[in-house]
């Protein structure tokens, strides 16, 4: 009985080992199949990625290719275009160009001769007016004032004055004034009269312009 029990236990153990081996084999096969499937899937993914990349590159090439074709259509010819003229057209006649001869020295000398023939403009010297010494008999007139080139306000003030001869003598009042006035009568002191040989310009500058009408000297009553 014990032997049969031992034999049954051994058979069960062997059966279990075989089952375990089968399970291990199946797991190994499943793992190998899973690995194969994984590799296959990876290959499919890589193939899909490569196809997508190739498709995008093709699309880019398709976009670039028409642009390059358009540029090539704008400039189809790189070399020079020969101008083929028909043989019936006659060539253009060239008109003869007349070149004037250079001026000879004889011709150039004509203006110089003209310049020598035409007299040059001579500048006349400025005439100097003679200055005569002032005498007692002389008196200033309008023409003398204009010749002196005096300022306009001074000339106008003199034009309103009546002409008066210049004399170094002292003028005394009439006898009627002497009879009515006090016994002591002093004449008005005259201004200093310039020398007789002094020119008119210096005499006019020496005098002071008179604003009112010129009258004779009046005596000073003391």
Swiss-Prot record:
The entry assigns this protein to a family as follows: Belongs to the beta-casein family.
Cellular localisation = Secreted
- Asked if the Swiss-Prot or TrEMBL record annotates the protein with the keyword Nucleus, the reply is no
**Residues making up the signal peptide according to the UniProt record:** 1-15
Instruction: Please provide the record's keywords in A-Z order.
Output: Milk protein, Phosphoprotein, Secreted, Signal
Q: Which Pfam families match?
A: Casein (PF00363)
Q: How would you summarize where this protein is expressed among tissues?
A: Mammary gland specific. Secreted in milk.
Instruction: Name any GO cellular component annotation.
Output: extracellular space
Modified positions (Phosphothreonine) in chain numbering: 27
Q: What does this protein do?
A: Important role in determination of the surface properties of the casein micelles.
- Superkingdom is Eukaryota
Q: What is this protein called?
A: Beta-casein
**Residues found modified as Phosphoserine:** 30, 32-34
Q: What is the lineage of its organism?
A: Eukaryota, Metazoa, Chordata, Craniata, Vertebrata
- Whether Membrane counts among this entry's keywords is no
């Amino acid at each position: 009985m014990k032997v049969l029990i031992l034999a049954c236990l051994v058979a069960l153990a062997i059966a279990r080992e075989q089952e375990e081996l089968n399970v291990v084999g199946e797991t190994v096969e499943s793992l190998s199949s899973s690995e194969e499937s994984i590799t296959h899937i990876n290959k499919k993914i890589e193939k899909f990625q490569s196809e997508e990349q190739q498709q995008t590159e093709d699309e880019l090439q398709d976009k670039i290719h028409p642009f390059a074709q358009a540029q090539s259509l704008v400039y189809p010819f790189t070399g020079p275009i020969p101008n083929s003229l028909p043989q019936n057209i006659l060539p253009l006649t060239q008109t003869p160009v007349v070149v004037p001869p250079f001026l000879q020295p004889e011709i150039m000398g004509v203006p110089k001769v003209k310049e020598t023939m035409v007299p040059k403009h001579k500048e006349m010297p400025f005439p100097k007016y003679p200055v005569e010494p002032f005498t007692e008999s002389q008196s200033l007139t309008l023409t003398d004032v204009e010749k002196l080139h005096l300022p306009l306000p001074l000339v106008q003030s003199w034009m309103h004055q009546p002409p008066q001869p210049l004399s170094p003598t002292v003028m005394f009042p009439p006898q009627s004034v002497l009879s009515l006035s006090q016994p002591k009568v002093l004449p008005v002191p005259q201004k200093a009269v310039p020398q007789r040989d002094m020119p008119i310009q210096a005499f006019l500058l020496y005098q002071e312009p008179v604003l009112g009408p010129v009258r004779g000297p009046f005596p000073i009553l003391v």
